[in-house]
Amino acid sequence: MATATLAGITVERDDEGYLKNPNDWTEEMAPELAKEMGIDTLTDEHWKVIRFMRQDFQEKGQVPTIRRMKVAGGIPVKDLYNLFPKGPAKKAAYIAGLGKPHGCI
């Protein structure tokens, strides 16, 4: 298990870089995590997805899938792919400090 310092806080990460403990995440970490995923700037639309994912995870105990983000979050799939190209669920979960969504390889 690796550790990293994000926004001045040392956190544990798994082999793929996801935070081991979602409670360690802060909003200040998100821009650093986004850069690791190739996203230079987080827009209001990115934050809408990130905040939905965190809230849904707290309520349901699972990382939301793309389908759940579309249905419960009201975020069109096309928008998800535009915001988080080549793997929106994985990238958004990573930036939100959550684990990899079920069904993602």
Kindly give the residue locations of the regions a language model identified:
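N-terminal first-folded block
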Residues: 4-36
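Metallocofactor- and cofactor-centric catalytic cores in central/energy metabolism, strongly enriched
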Residues: 30, 35-54, 58-59, 66, ...
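General structural signal for secondary-structure boundaries
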Residues: 26, 43-45, 76
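A short, ordered amphipathic alpha-helix with a cationic face
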Residues: 18-24, 55-58, 66-67, 79-80
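Helix-rich interaction surfaces within compact, conserved domain-sized segments
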Residues: 13, 65-105
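A short, structure-level motif marking secondary-structure boundaries and short turns
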Residues: 14-16, 50-52, 74
